């Protein structure tokens, strides 16, 4: 069986690997943060499709109102202009 002290001492190679890992993490941390922010912005941003659909819906609604009032007013005007009513 090994001694208790042997488990607490680390090999120089392991210490070196741990140090390299810390340095690598410090280097990549801003890159990871930027990637995370970009993904979040992409997820919450309004896309071109949504804007196009909203504009199309508003246009269709305006066209429906216009057609309704056009037809409503044009039938009233035609009734007033009938020459056969004399």
Curated annotation (Swiss-Prot):
InterPro entries per UniProt: TRIQK
Record's subcellular location: Endoplasmic reticulum membrane
Residue ranges of the TM segments: 51-71
Membrane topology designation: Single-pass membrane protein
GO cellular component, one term: endoplasmic reticulum membrane
UniProt similarity note: Belongs to the TRIQK family.
Role according to the record: May play a role in cell growth and maintenance of cell morphology.
Protein name according to UniProt: Triple QxxK/R motif-containing protein
Organism name: Rattus norvegicus (Rat)
